């Protein structure tokens, strides 16, 4: 899955925005202001996703393309290599999981006001 496809998929999820919070090359995707995915436009061979801590470890054990994210809390963030053997559908499921992990931490009233964010299962 290339970076354009990843970007398009992230932006297709409800209420997602993109910005450059750190510098002019680090692209972040947010739901309600909270980051769930990031990539460096100067090194588009990888991107990072939030993950449930237990699942993060399992994924790293099973897939060489998935490692702890550099410069992030490795307990919660995985780095995904885009040039490995992971299928597009699997990468999309990881993106949905990341989105869902962030949505779970949002205040309950946000889900009531924007129920579309609760429809994404990861």
Predicted regions and their residues:
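Charge-dense, helix-prone N-terminal extensions
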Residues: 1-122
